[in-house]
Amino acid sequence: MASERPRAAMIMAAGRGERMRPLTDTTPKPLLRVHGQPLIERHLERLVHAGIQRIVINLAWLGGQIRDYLADGTRYGAAITYSEEAPSALDAGGGVFRALPYLSPGPFAVVNGDSYTDFPFETLTIAGQYDSHLVLVPNPAYLQGDFGLARGEVLTRGEALARGTELFTFGGIAVYRNAFFAGAQDGVFPIMPLWQRSMAAGKCSGQLYSGVWEDVGTPERLDALNAARITT
């Protein structure tokens, strides 16, 4: 079936950032800077460069700072809509589900606001027979991997181990269709059960990306990233 590019994108920005404390006691994690630029601003600019101007950002912890910094997105060539989750974040599944009215019609991309990558968003697509598409990355030293990849489809960790295939880490970039969230209800819920359902049905495609990628999850990783020479 023909592949489609995402028509909109959501940047996940509502989390408390517990592992990044004390930095996140006063600054939301997506506004932490790598080489002088907030993580979320880099994602926004790269999405717009890839032709995705319709952007949704979910907010909870210190969300007002993100809104104040990015405003309506005009200066970036974007049209930003904010999805409020206060007083606390709805987890990944609940956060995206609440934002569906702003993202429809799909397909749409979802990007973790606390990652750093040079992934080329202009190449991101999803084929017609799938309801989800995950970008996987080689495992960093601090992770063992949660998913396998076989013939362009993502496998659960259990299935990958059973088949003896290599494990990879979710790279914080995905594409979804509305059908992926069938049966979900507004509230707090993780996205993993929906991934597992999609994988079991053979509806979750994937790709491996081996370029620049870092989960900026701790102060030590942030310091290391800022100390590194990065040209992207």
Task: Report each predicted region and the residues it spans.
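Conserved N-terminal catalytic core of the sugar/cofactor nucleotidyltransferase
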Residues: 1-11, 33, 37-112, 121, ...
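Catalytic-core segments of class I nucleotidyltransferases/pyrophosphorylases
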Residues: 107-109, 116, 121-128, 139-141, ...
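Active-site metal-binding loops of divalent metal-dependent hydrolases
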Residues: 16, 113-115
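Hydrophobic packing residues within well-ordered alpha-helices of enzyme cores
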Residues: 20, 66-70, 225
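Conserved beta-strand segments of alpha/beta enzyme cores
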Residues: 30, 79-81, 131, 203-205
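A phosphate-binding catalytic loop at a beta-strand-loop-alpha-helix junction
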Residues: 7-23
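Short beta-strand-to-loop element that shapes/binds the nucleotide-sugar donor at the catalytic cleft/hinge
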Residues: 133-149
